[in-house]
Amino acid sequence: MAVVIKFFRWIWQKISRWVFFWKHKAKSVIMDHTDSKKNELKAEKAFKVSETFKLVEPPKEAKVSKMDVSPKVVDPCLLAKTTMDGAAVEAGRRRRSLLKLPQAAVKSVSMLMASALQSGWQMCSWKSSVSSTSVASQMKTRSPLESREAAMLREVYLVLWAIRKQLRQVARRQERRRRHHLRAHMGPQPDPAQGLKQDARSPL
């Protein structure tokens, strides 16, 4: 019974470390996003201050025509375009980092399943060997697969397998959404073979 308790403690520690790791990773992604927003705001403020200095700067020559003295006004459309482009780039980076989370989670769960199987099988085989040497009067020793620990190991493996299956479905769903989003932005591409057929049918 103590071996079973140790095994479950080990499984629980693995799962808790995995959950803590992904929580920390999500927090770091959010912190990076906020830091990039702050940097964008600082750059925009510095840009505005430099433009105001340019506007206030006096002319070098005293005798200049009125058309040369006209100050340089910042185009608001250009400024809005630059800020929108920066926000779009940052949103794309964040989306890519969030898309990688389910795939990395699938890999970590697969590694956890493999390590749980390996350690559980070693534990079951060790216990069966100990019981067979201690009980020498028995005619036939049971297989390690028929032990209670093996049944618990199978249950833990099934739970991890279900978690990995759900994570794979989430990753596939996000990949489909990303492809659909890219197709919607790019628009339908004309088929060159169809264009050649139309040219062949046309009388001109």
Swiss-Prot record:
Basic residues: compositionally biased ranges: 172-184
GO terms of biological process kind: spermatid development
Lineage top rank: taxon: Eukaryota
A Pfam match: DUF4703
Phosphoserine: modified positions: 65
Keyword Phosphoprotein: yes
Localization per Swiss-Prot or TrEMBL: Cytoplasmic vesicle, Secretory vesicle, Acrosome
Location of the region described as Disordered in the Swiss-Prot/TrEMBL record: 172-204
GO cellular component terms given for this protein: acrosomal vesicle
Function: May play an important role in acrosome formation and nucleus shaping during spermiogenesis.
PANTHER family named among the record's database cross-references: CHROMOSOME 7 OPEN READING FRAME 61 (PTHR39221), SPERM ACROSOME DEVELOPMENTAL REGULATOR (PTHR39221:SF1)
Annotated protein name in UniProt: Sperm acrosome developmental regulator
Species this protein is from: Bos taurus
Gene that produces this protein: SPACDR
